[in-house]
UniProtKB/Swiss-Prot annotation:
GO terms for cellular component: cytosol. Monomer. Binds 30S ribosomal subunits, but not 50S ribosomal subunits or 70S ribosomes. The keyword Ion transport does not apply. The gene is rbfA. One of several proteins that assist in the late maturation steps of the functional core of the 30S ribosomal subunit. Associates with free 30S ribosomal subunits (but not with 30S subunits that are part of 70S ribosomes or polysomes). Required for efficient processing of 16S rRNA. May interact with the 5'-terminal helix region of 16S rRNA. This is Ribosome-binding factor A. The lineage of its organism: Bacteria, Pseudomonadati, Pseudomonadota, Gammaproteobacteria, Vibrionales. The keyword Cytoplasm applies. Its main location: cytoplasm. PROSITE patterns: RBFA. Belongs to the RbfA family. Pfam families: RBFA. It is found in: Cytoplasm. It comes from the Bacteria.
């Protein structure tokens, strides 16, 4: 009988929770802004973890600058993570910007524009029929 979740999925979920707590409470860097961890992918041997993040950038901050600031803290975050979780080997962490939220908003805006354009065309064609 197979397990509902594989060990790598359970470790990824735990890493996501712990990393969120570490970033929220222990990493103090004004360059980061508000960081959200959207997903964590762990390799099968649990040696590497890809952490996908999004940022709420304020002022002159860009996602690229926030990601660069976060990458400066990778070693320190890994050390804190090692103290919080019990694994034989703490995964090497790599942060990646997750643009799915931005792409989703862009797609939503495109759909809204098309719907509004269609409504406008229907109104215009309805007026032409009346004349």
């Amino acid at each position: 009988m197979s397990k509902e979740f594989s060990r790598t999925q359970r470790v990824a979920q735990q890493l996501q929770k712990e990393l969120a707590m570490i970033l929220q409470r222990e990493v103090r860097d004004s360059r980061l802004g508000m960081v959200t961890i959207s997903d964590v992918e762990v390799s099968r041997d649990l040696a590497y973890a890809k952490v996908f993040v999004t940022f709420l950038c304020v002022g002159e901050q860009t996602p690229e600058s926030c990601l660069a600031a976060l990458r400066e803290h990778e070693v320190h975050i890994r050390m804190m993570l090692g103290k919080r979780i019990r694994l034989r080997l703490t995964p090497e962490i790599r942060f990646y910007y997750d643009n799915t939220l931005v792409e989703g908003m862009r797609m939503s805006n495109l759909v809204t524009e098309v719907v509004n354009s269609d409504k406008q065309k229907q109104k215009n064609s309805g007026r032409e029929d009346e004349e």
